[in-house]
Structures are given as C-alpha cells and as structure tokens.
Amino acid sequence: MAVRIAPLRLVDYEDVIALWRRSGLTNYVQLRDSRRAFARQLRSNRGLYLGAFDRKRLVGTVLGTHDTRKGWINRLAVDPAYQRRGVGTRLLRASETALARKGMKVISAFITNGNAPSLNLFRRSGYQIVDEMTYVRKKLDPDA
C-alpha cells in the first residue's frame, strides 16, 4: 500500500464528503460543509487541508486550522478499509508539521465522546486529555 499525503483540492470535494460518510463523521453539506464553504476554507487554510491517497482514491482526511496562536486538528478520518494501517498516524503527523510551519506551538483537537480509536491515536501521539475544559457553542444559524 503506497498511500501518499497531499493537499486537498476542490476537485476532491465529493470524495471528501463520501469518505466522511463511510467513516461515520457527521457532515453538514447544506451549510458549513457545502462545496462553497469547502472552497473558501481551502483558500483560508492553504496547505493545511490534507488527504491520504491510495493512487487516486481518497482514503483519509485531516483539516488543519489555526487562530494564529493555536493549531487545531479537525476531521481526521480514515476509510474503514484502511484503518489500523498507520494512515491516521501519518495524517496527524503531516498536519502537525504543516501547523508547525505556520508557527503553531500548541495543537488541539476535539474528539467525540466514545470515539476510542481516535482518542487512542491522539494519546499515542503525545496528546494529553484536558479534563478542566468544557466545550460550549452558540449557533448563530440554527441550521449550522
């Protein structure tokens, strides 16, 4: 298996959404995960939206973002047929490297409760669980 990591492009959009569905990630194609939103995000996060490709087939994604002081790992997903083969680890490391090049010294991620494989990946990669934090949000658009 010769999986390569490369920046995602707009032409990958349909494959990204299909991969997220196969891997069980919730997606919001009507709004924040729409093609238009994805295009805007690609421009804003140049070099941080990465895909794992087996030949031309998209088998994994990781979306790196930052607020100029902290990096974020988002949407780390691997096709179920490619899980437990190191693809997630390679995507995580590639994202860390890309964020470090942007000057990020701290990288964080939100992991859905009950997602033990993802939590284990981050633990094995040196991430610490921060128990004193609580995630809060406010939807300015109820469909967001």
Predicted regions and their residues:
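Short phosphate-binding/catalytic loops that engage adenosine nucleotides
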Residues: 87, 104, 127
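Acetyl-CoA-dependent GNAT
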Residues: 7-75, 98, 129-141
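Conserved GNAT acetyl-CoA-binding A-motif
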Residues: 92, 99-111
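Extreme N-terminal starter segment of soluble prokaryotic enzymes
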Residues: 2-4
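Conserved beta-strand-loop-alpha-helix junction that forms the acyl-donor binding cleft
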Residues: 83, 109-118
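Short acidic, glycine/proline-enriched helix-loop-strand junctions
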Residues: 117-129
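Conserved acetyl-CoA-binding loop-helix of GNAT-fold acetyltransferases
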Residues: 84-97, 124
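Short, conserved catalytic or interaction motifs in soluble domains
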Residues: 78
